[in-house]
Amino acid sequence: MGAPTAKRQTQATEPTTDAPVAIPQTEGAEEDEVMISMDGPREDIAVLQEKDDDAEMTLDQDGKPRFASAVNAGEGVKPGRMKVPIPPHRMAPLKNEWMKIYPPLVEQLKLQVRMNPRKKQLELRTCSNTVDNSALQKGTDFVRAFTLGFDVDDAMAIIRLDELYVETFEIKDVKTLQGDHLGRAIGRIAGKDGKTKFAIENASRTRVVLADSKIHILGGFTNIKIAREAIVSLILGSPPGKVYGNLRIVASRMKERF
């Protein structure tokens, strides 16, 4: 009887492999398991994703996404500098009209302006407040238009409208004239008291400047073409009455179109 009893005691005292074994864990180990565990729901990640979605996209009343304006997105305005030479005969008008010239450059285009009397040039450059990449080019075109002889109010249209530019050509590009013949051609373009020039400007919706043998036209592409054709006809010798008639026809067509 002693042997079976001893055998049973040894079987009862032997530990079974199926029972769970308690393994001591330190506080650092528990923290590591929490940080790397991916089994449970990650509420913190979901909250961050919701915040990012709300910041990037909003919905309107119809449920359509509304994104932020992309005007200032991407790269900023590149630094640039332009120098516009001022002719000697335009220095006095520039000084007289200075209070009208610099406000659109500084307030609207956000440029920095400096007048260099020694070199007789106007310097423009971008700064941290400049928001438009085309501001420097617009400011340069505005100052150049004034130096060519246009009024400040007419040249300021270049800043407001994008499709305006200045075209320049000489009378000798149309027909070789010298001496009195050249003077008569200029007089035919201007007309008595400037009536012919004003008629061309009103019919074509442009501005024309007669600077000796050079002619500067400010306006849109189509409008400049109409004014140029009328001026070329006068240079070639067409009667002013015929040119007026053609301008009336063109003006009526433009009114019907617009």
From Swiss-Prot:
Gene3D superfamilies, sorted: K Homology domain, type 1
Disulfide bonding pattern of the chain: none
Top-rank lineage group of the source organism: Eukaryota
Locations listed in the record: Cytoplasm; Nucleus, Nucleolus
A molecular function GO annotation: RNA binding
PANTHER family in alphabetical order: RIBONUCLEASE Y, RNA-BINDING PROTEIN PNO1
Name of the protein in its database record: Pre-rRNA-processing protein PNO1
